[in-house]
Amino acid sequence: IYDNIAIVSTNSYIFNGTILDNLMVANKSASEKEIVKALKTARLYDFVNSLKDGLLTYVGQSGSNLSGGQKQRLALARAILSNREMIIFDEATSNIDVESEENIWKAIYDLSKKKTILVISHRLANVKDAKKIYVLNKGKLVEEGSHDSLMQNKSYYFDMVNKQEELELSLIHI
């Protein structure tokens, strides 16, 4: 099973070395074309190209020379390069800026056309466009369906979405 799954989590590990080193961990025989495609899909290509040393840029211990969003997009590019059948995103956008989050979600939806994608998220706005949403409560599956069908059911998911939207609105007005 492990050989078919890649994971991008909140704290995906970035190795001490270069951007290229971090990518090659996923696929030691990756071609330049595959690397460029992974970087473009992860919305990281322009950033890497803007760096003086490009792919050979040293990222520092645990990616200390990169922002949170850049680290997550590097982890995403690495997952893409691994060419696994399934990619699991476990709260992958929870600790990053809005622009990076938007870029990562665009990449995730692009990937979902060719790969099986599993998104674990407490931010329900992140899963509205998913083909299928599974709602768990205390470890048990309580609902499944599209966003629209779950909202029409006016059950557990509906309540969670409304509570989350109310909370976000109240935070805006503070």
Regions found by a protein language model. Give the residues of each.
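Conserved catalytic loops of ABC-family nucleotide-binding domains
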Residues: 110-119, 127
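Conserved catalytic motifs of ABC-family nucleotide-binding domains
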Residues: 11-30, 66, 126-127
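ABC ATPase nucleotide-binding domain "signature" region
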Residues: 67-68, 74-79, 103, 119
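ABC ATPase nucleotide-binding domain helical subdomain, centered on the C-loop/LSGGQ "ABC signature"
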Residues: 2, 20-61, 105-106, 114
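A short, proline-enriched helix->beta-strand linker immediately N-terminal to the Walker B motif
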Residues: 81-85, 114
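Catalytic Walker B motif of ABC-type/P-loop ATPase nucleotide-binding domains
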Residues: 87-91
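ABC-fold ATPase nucleotide-binding domain signature/coupling loops
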Residues: 45-74, 96-99, 166-171
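C-terminal portion of ABC ATPase nucleotide-binding domains
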Residues: 50, 54, 106, 128-171
